[in-house]
Structures are given as structure tokens and as C-alpha cells.
């Protein structure tokens, strides 16, 4: 059984695979102040509630957008699972060529999502990750990572409105009944939900013009914590796949293992 852990700036998503099947998935708050033991107890308890034991885990793969947490999770894996995890980063074979000025600048989560998306949907392709930031990544028809766009996420933007506009309340991030709002809460929800959907559609169209100028068929897939909330509001998004990064971790782990066996 493979345990996959995707550490984002706001949330950490974990899942267990048996072969290609995702058996269970959990989302917890990312907290750099948690200790190795706190993370160990958290993951083992979540697994136990789903009917799994730590002894069933034979491998761990990690992608992290929070570098200080990597050593904590590595120690946690060694203590609670008796395993050395595969941490996706420079030097790990992903099977994807990275066409970026400095490949080391690209976050592991972006590459992991791109690998899974190309494997599942083919290219050319744009991956829209609705997380702490909204990140759009482009993959060529040949499976090359070409770069992308980073914009503020909806939670960050909503919090900024609450913090810096004295009369605006903190609002629940849900779809309002209409775009033309008749109260402040709905007006903020309209601006956030419909506004960011329009932002994504415009960015996708601009990227498509460069990625697929002949219009042969560029696919667009959404992932991330807010994917299910926003994907349906975006005219350009064709697929919604919230578990994309976990799938990418599985694929990269399998490729890494295949390369290690071939190298012996």
C-alpha cells in the first residue's frame, strides 16, 4: 500500500493506494508547528478510522510546497511507518521534461499535477489548481511542462477584503444566487466566485492562444481544494479532478521504482 502526502500552504491532502486504486483520502490543515509525533498520530489515526494499519503501508511519496515540513514528515515516516519516503524534488525522475528558465523554481505540486493530468488526459493541456494560489500550468502535446500563471487564490482574496476593508464581513465561499447582488454578502460572493471564474477563463484563453494556436484541441482540467466550487462556473474547464496530485505522486513513485529496478 502506498501512502501519498501532498503538502499545500493551507491544506495537506493524503491518500492511500493499492495499485492504481485510491482507497481513501483525507484533507487536514497544514501546520508547520506540528511535531513529527503529532503528524504521525494524525495519519495513523485517520488510517485506522478507515480500516487500515500503519503496517500495511509499504511506501510513502511526498510533495511539499512548505519546505520546513519536509524533514518533519521524513522523520515521521521513519518512526511511524519504518520507511524512507520518496520526496518529489530535484533529482527525482518524473518522466516529464521541464521547459522552464530555472526548473528548480517549479513547485513539486505543480509537476506532480502536470504528470497526472498528462497521463490521464493527454496533451496539449492546461491544469488549473484552485488552492492557496490559483495556478495554471501548461503541458505540450509531447508531455513537456511549459510553465504557467500564478494568481491569488479565492481564500487569500476573501481574507484580504475582510482584513483591509473595514465594513466588509468575512463571508462563506459559496455560489451566490445571482451575479447582480442585493446585499453585501452576496455582492462579495459574486465578486469572488464569478470574478475568479472569469479571471481563469480569460487566462486559459490567453494560454490556449500560445499553446494551441491552431485550435486542435487543448484540454483543461481543474484540481485543488476549491476545484469543485469553481470549475462549474468556468466556461473553459472540461474536467474536474480534485485528487490529481495524489495520482501524480503514485505515478512518479512507480516511475522512480521502475528506474531503480532498471538501474540495478
Swiss-Prot record:
Pathway: Cofactor biosynthesis; coenzyme A biosynthesis; CoA from (R)-pantothenate: step 1/5. Its main location: cytoplasm. GO terms for molecular function: ATP binding; metal ion binding; pantothenate kinase activity. One of its GO terms (biological process) is coenzyme A biosynthetic process. Gene3D superfamilies: 3.30.420.40. The keyword Nucleus does not apply. Transmembrane segments: none annotated. Its cofactor is NH4(+); K(+). ATP binds at residues 6-13, 132. Substrate binds at residues 100, 107-110, 184. GO terms for cellular component: cytoplasm. Belongs to the type III pantothenate kinase family. Catalyzes the phosphorylation of pantothenate (Pan), the first step in CoA biosynthesis. This is Type III pantothenate kinase 2. It comes from Symbiobacterium thermophilum (strain DSM 24528 / JCM 14929 / IAM 14863 / T).
